[in-house]
Amino acid sequence: MNSFYPSRKLGQNFTVDQSVIAKTCRLIKSLNPTALIEVGPGKGALTKALLKLQLPYHGIELDKRLAEYLLVNEILTEEQLTIGDALKQNLDQYFPDTIPLLCGNIPYSISSPLIANFLASKLQQFVLVCQWEFGQRLVAPVNSPNYSAFGVFCQYHLQIKSVFKIDKVAFKPKPQVDSVLMLLKKKPQVAYEAHFGRFLKQCFHQRRKLLVNNLKQLLPPTLLTNVLQQQDLAATVRAQELTPTQLFRLYLSLKPHLSDGKD
């Protein structure tokens, strides 16, 4: 595969720094997984290190050229590889008798939907390399410029840790921005609420607007004002001023009044 050209459309930037690969594997090993699912094994740099952990493994690769490379070079067997889109896969199908750890170097374009797919599955831990800016949005505090609907959604459901920053020179081709290794763990006793995410999108639709105004297409303003008052929140509050817990409590109070009990 000497003539292989990475796909810009697929956001392919392969990890070439062995120290980054080693640190990633050490983190994964410390989490004591029983099996591994890797999204985007690419040319197998991280894959080879993961296989040395001697755990049940399955990779999901969208690029047929890379899938062929992995098979021809006997990095993976056909049983260890799914050729397809990770966003369209049921992540629970690969190891029905155990709960695997999800990992991978994730293109920016699929970072959010892949986390959503992870949240909807039975999987509990996700170790991912993503763009630095995206990682910052995941951990952004209340009332900060990066505080967003998706960040709130993730913070409510997950324990999120930014493990270490990765310089762009660790990848080939070199991306324009740095990356970060993130660790996502599902919070115990927190049930997945998909409709909460859609509710949050409306809450943050226009950041400068009051929450009442952002939600007026879904609910009568008087109803929303009354619910805010019941929760000791001002009628002039904006979504970015509320914690994930406050926003979820608000969602639960308003849920019966949303269409079909949803948003």
UniProtKB/Swiss-Prot annotation:
Q: Which residues bind S-adenosyl-L-methionine?
A: N13, T15, G40, E61, D85, N105
The record ties this protein, via SMART domains, to: rADc
Places the protein is found: Cytoplasm
This protein's GO CC annotations: cytosol
Assigned protein family: Belongs to the class I-like SAM-binding methyltransferase superfamily. rRNA adenine N(6)-methyltransferase family. RsmA subfamily.
Identify which top EC class this enzyme belongs to: transferase
Functional note: Specifically dimethylates two adjacent adenosines (A1518 and A1519) in the loop of a conserved hairpin near the 3'-end of 16S rRNA in the 30S particle. May play a critical role in biogenesis of 30S subunits.
What GO molecular function terms would the record report?
Answer: 16S rRNA (adenine(1518)-N(6)/adenine(1519)-N(6))-dimethyltransferase activity; RNA binding
State which Enzyme Commission number(s) the record gives. Answer: 2.1.1.182
What are the UniProt keywords, alphabetically? Answer: Cytoplasm, Methyltransferase, RNA-binding, rRNA processing, S-adenosyl-L-methionine, Transferase
InterPro entries named in the record: KsgA/Erm, rRNA_Ade_diMease-like_C, rRNA_Ade_Mease_Trfase_CS, rRNA_Ade_methylase_Trfase_N, rRNA_adenine_dimethylase, SAM-dependent_MTases_sf
Q: Cite the Pfam families for this sequence.
A: RrnaAD
- Tell whether Cell membrane is among the UniProt keywords: no
**Reactions performed catalytically:** adenosine(1518)/adenosine(1519) in 16S rRNA + 4 S-adenosyl-L-methionine = N(6)-dimethyladenosine(1518)/N(6)-dimethyladenosine(1519) in 16S rRNA + 4 S-adenosyl-L-homocysteine + 4 H(+)
Name under which the protein is recorded? Ribosomal RNA small subunit methyltransferase A
Annotated organism of origin: Mycoplasma pneumoniae (strain ATCC 29342 / M129 / Subtype 1) (Mycoplasmoides pneumoniae)
Q: Where the protein is mainly located, per its record? A: cytoplasm
Q: Which domain of life is it from?
A: Bacteria
